[in-house]
Design a protein with these regions (language model features):
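Glycine-rich phosphate-binding loops of nucleotide-dependent enzymes
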Residues: 1-168
Length: 168
């Protein structure tokens, strides 16, 4: 599982090195920088597959710190996928992104959700409406509504909590 609001990449390492470290962790040898190049390069094929899957092929040699914000989120998804989780926790994965990056990350989330459960906290309603099968709306620690987007978005308690009585 991984949360997004704090960047979780090594900014001075390349995209490939970041994913390779995550793969090392999966093998039980995380952050083993002293391994031979041969041993580390054994991970490169799978690392490249993950990099391709998240659309970062053209950034493989770039350091993570050089990546645009949305591409860093894609790298975080790649490093998470390297661990082959059954569930991913995404905390506002599109916060602060441009429209183009939101679309790219939403498509990527849709793709990875096909093979695992994704639990997402998100305030961008267009992202919620396109990605979510089941929605739970919380306000002040209380569950206001649960269901699909249509039923939740028209629920009077949800409308009141998020839009106020003038919109009801």
């Amino acid at each position: 599982m991984r949360s997004f609001q704090i960047s979780a990449v090594f900014p001075h390492l390349t995209v490939l090195e970041n994913v390779r470290i995550a793969l090392q962790r999966r093998r039980g040898s995380s952050l083993d920088f002293w391994r031979s190049d041969r041993v580390l390069h054994e991970l490169d094929e799978r690392a490249q597959e993950l990099i391709d899957a998240v659309g970062l092929s053209s950034f493989v040699g770039s350091t993570a710190g050089e990546l645009p914000y949305g591409r860093k989120r894609a790298l975080e998804i790649a490093t998470t996928l390297a661990l082959d989780p059954e569930m991913m926790l995404l905390d506002e994965p599109t916060a602060g992104m441009t429209h183009e990056d939101v679309e790219r990350i939403a498509a990527l989330i849709r793709k990875v959700a096909a093979n695992r459960t994704v639990l997402m906290v998100e305030h961008n309603l267009s992202v919620v409406s396109t990605l979510s099968d089941q929605i739970t709306v919380l306000a002040r620690g209380e569950v206001l509504a649960e269901g699909d987007y249509q039923s939740v978005s028209t629920n009077p308690k949800v409308v009141e909590a998020y839009l106020g009585t003038a919109h009801g």
